[in-house]
Amino acid sequence: MRRFIILATLLLGACTTPGGYVDGPSTPVITADDESIIAYIDKRLVEEYYWLDEVVEKEHTFNRRQQWEEYLPSALSKLVSNADDGGYNHNGQRVYYSFIREDKSTRTQTQGYGISVYPSILAFSNDELAFVVDYIYPDSPAAKSGLRRGDFVVTVNGTAILRSNYQSLLATLLNGTSSIELTYMRQTVAEDEAKSGRVTLSHFAYEENPVVHSEVIELGDRRVGYLVYTSFDADFEEQLMVALQEFHQAAISDIILDLRCNGGGNVSVAQSLASAILGVGYEGKTLCELRRNPLNKRDASTSVIDLRAEEVSLDMERLVVIGSKYTASASEMIIDGLRGLDVEVVLVGSTTEGKNCGMDVTRVRCGSTTVEYAPITFMCYNAKGRGDYGEGISPDVDLTVENVTGYSDEYYPLPRCIWGDASHDIALFAALNAIMEGDATRAVPFVGGGDKITTEVELPREFIGARYDI
């Protein structure tokens, strides 16, 4: 089997992913909108930022003669007490969870192709690269084309992806406004499937429904609800509850919550999900506390997030979670919050990101620009007062090293196959193995029909590695 190298992380924007580089000085043209937005940034930093004490001390050092898009990371870089607000990227640059961005639309529909690209690129040779499909939104142009999770995109509109052009081709793939042609290679195929192909994607409106996969897996005498959930998005809470209702109607005995691609989102949606999983027996018990700086002028109180009655009640006694280094924020709150109630939570995958803080998000119009602004304003603690997972939550089964399943993948969570394929998805295999209490030989035949997990895929060309600043 041939092996490959994962290259530099793609800096794809998301509200729960650290963002905002600290760049060098510049002399841009300052507009009235810049001044208005910077004043709003300052107001919330001084009044609400979790580390506002230091902001008050040092705000006189902030450089306000710059464009508003650059101001927030520049100001935050003057502080030393805010280590939990983000971290450092692979180039050693300081990045932040706190963000401000232009809010162009509040529509639930998105214009595009419906592809989420895995946050690392692969190299076939010194020059040739590939984008990896992380997941596809249901009913999107990409879904209708037959493109699927784990595919390697090797050309865009007939152009090979190279070090010299990958940035522009990635922009075309993510932000294109017309039809697009992609050539792909497929890692795992059935006997009658081609290992490569070409698709043309139309550009039209679709919904970014974060419930990207849901099914009930028959595992001997057990019925396992398997839910792949990519974001705690309040606009799609109804779709989440529909999936859980289907689990309830199927009388599932166990549940696997796949959060490996989920960087967080709305606390209320996480509250609803946890409430539905545990059921009415936990109503009124505290999932977490959101603690703010006592000097916060907008809201210095601690918000207590209690479990509540939901229309769906699964009454699970155990939760198996698939996680990764991209699992963060509200996803980690689910794991840590349930453990604070002494619920058994089995974490399979790798250490999570470690975002134990959150934001009070506001949207406001400043001059001619509407912005969405989310500075870190609170820290998360479970019912036992624990919240120290700033370095991430360690897995019970670490798939990147030797473990109890007998299978590992040093490149995890690189997508290998479609959702639900336990013969090739080592994480799903390990999660089912946990449900079967270590009987891996029982788990695989029931689901994938195979006798091993493919952790090294045979590729037509050799992968070699280098790091690229994206």
Map each language-model feature to its residues.
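Positively charged n-region of N-terminal signal peptides that target proteins for export
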Residues: 1-4
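Bacterial Sec-dependent N-terminal signal peptides
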Residues: 7-35
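Extended, small/polar residue-biased N-terminal targeting/export presequences
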Residues: 33-130, 179-213
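Solvent-exposed loop/turn segments at secondary-structure junctions
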Residues: 48, 122-124, 139-141, 159-161, ...
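PDZ/PDZ-like domain segments forming the peptide/carboxylate-binding groove
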Residues: 108-155, 159-162, 226, 233-239
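Extracytoplasmic
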Residues: 110-114, 128-130, 148, 177-179, ...
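C-terminal, low-ordered peptide segments at domain boundaries
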Residues: 155-252, 307
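C-terminal "post-core" interaction segments
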Residues: 225-227, 236-242, 246-247, 252-254, ...
